[in-house]
Amino acid sequence: MGGKTVTRADLAEAVYRKVGLSRTESAQIVEMVLQEVCDAIVRGETVKLSSFATFQVREKNERVGRNPKTGEEVPISPRRVMTFKASNVLKSRILRAHQTRKPSKEATASS
C-alpha cells in the first residue's frame, strides 16, 4: 500500500508537463492553489473540490477521556479539527484501481 509520496514539486512538474507553462509559473500556481485552500480552512470555511474531496473544520466539545494504561479520567479540551472526506468519484476510482491490481501471492496460493 505504501507507494510514492507526491510532493508540491511533483504537482508543479505535472502542471509544467501537462499545461505547458514554465516550471516557475507551474510552481507558483500550485503554491497559490494550496495557499488558497489552506487560508479558507484556517478561516473555518468548507473547501469542496468537486470529484475530489471536501475539507471541513469541525468544533469538538470538551469531553472526558481515559488514560488507557491507568483508566484514569482525563479532561480533553475543546478544539477545532479538520476533516477530509473523499468524494464518491474519488472513492470509486480508488476501488477500481485496487480491483485491477494483480492478485497477491497469498490470494493465488489459497485458490
From Swiss-Prot:
The keyword Transcription regulation applies. Pfam families: Bac_DNA_binding. GO terms for molecular function: DNA binding; structural constituent of chromatin. SMART domains: BHL. GO terms for biological process: DNA recombination; positive regulation of metabolic process; regulation of DNA-templated transcription; regulation of translation. It comes from the Bacteria. InterPro entries: Hist_DNA-bd, Histone-like_DNA-bd_CS, IHF-like_DNA-bd_dom_sf, IHF_alpha. Keywords: DNA recombination, DNA-binding, Transcription, Transcription regulation, Translation regulation. GO terms for cellular component: cytosol. The keyword Transcription applies. Belongs to the bacterial histone-like protein family. Heterodimer of an alpha and a beta chain. This protein is one of the two subunits of integration host factor, a specific DNA-binding protein that functions in genetic recombination as well as in transcriptional and translational control. HAMAP family: IHF_alpha. This is Integration host factor subunit alpha. The lineage of its organism: Bacteria, Pseudomonadati, Pseudomonadota, Alphaproteobacteria, Hyphomicrobiales.
